[in-house]
UniProtKB/Swiss-Prot annotation:
Annotated region described as Disordered, given as residue ranges: 19-39
Any GO BP: regulation of blood pressure
Gene Ontology CC, one term: extracellular region
Propeptide boundaries: 1-8
Function: Snake venom natriuretic peptide that targets both NPR1 and NPR2. Exhibits hypotensive and vasodepressor activities.
Organism: Notechis scutatus scutatus (Mainland tiger snake)
Tissue spec: Expressed by the venom gland.
Family as reported in the entry's similarity comment: Belongs to the natriuretic peptide family.
Protein name: Natriuretic peptide NsNP-b
Main localisation: secreted
Amino acid sequence: SGSKTAKIGDGCFGLPLDRIGSTSGMGCGSVPKPTPGGS
């Protein structure tokens, strides 16, 4: 799984995110999800 695909592709909710992809990706870091947080 790619960190970029997992973060933006599925996001935290596992849904195809576009404009909110960035926002969800950042918040994903705090949530214990199988998504590797970047910054």
